[in-house]
Regions:
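Core catalytic alpha/beta fold that binds nucleotide/phospho-ligands
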Residues: 1-166
Length: 166
């Protein structure tokens, strides 16, 4: 199936932002490519034929209604980033898809926190390099490093952890 115009635009804007971030990191753009894991998580790699073995930073890219967000982290760590419009309302019927037990009860009583929990869990899914193969209901945010903040009209969450640790 062909990608929609919107999807292509999101992809391209994310890649342009990633290029800027990689350039600001001080890496040569002509020697690096973006590859994907089996779960479609992006990562940087030296282009075949470039004889460098220094580790590359971990990366994550996200999109939201015309915005692109990107995060880089020092080698040896995994990172995930997610963003949503800060005024986006998560419908209460979606709460059971993203939380259970005490967390679900908290969400029901504090529905304004839903966007923070939603973006935090999406960031964790990306940092774990498992994407949607990690059920958000099974993510206990207390077990992860997550920072959330507002930038313009976006609510952004970033999660990171040591690569390969369980």
């Amino acid at each position: 199936p062909r990608a929609t115009q919107k999807r292509l635009k999101d992809h391209n804007s994310g890649r342009l932002l990633l290029e800027k971030c990689v350039e600001n990191w001080g890496l040569p753009l002509d020697s690096i490519e973006v590859l994907r894991t089996e779960h479609r998580a992006p990562y940087l790699s030296w282009i075949s034929g470039v004889w460098r073995n220094e580790p590359l930073p971990g990366i994550s890219i996200g999109h939201c209604e015309g915005w692109a967000v990107c995060a880089l982290v020092e080698p040896g760590y995994w990172i995930g980033i997610d963003a949503e419009k800060k005024n986006r309302q998560i419908q209460s019927n979606a709460f059971e898809m993203m939380a259970k037990g005490e967390e679900l009860n908290f969400l029901i009583e504090n529905s304004k926190m839903a966007i923070k929990i939603w973006t935090a869990k999406e960031a964790v899914q990306k940092a774990e390099k498992l994407g949607m193969h990690l059920n958000p209901r099974d993510i206990n945010l207390d077990n992860y490093k997550v920072e959330s903040f507002i930038h313009d009209d976006l609510f952004v969450s970033v999660s990171w952890r040591k690569a390969g640790e369980n």
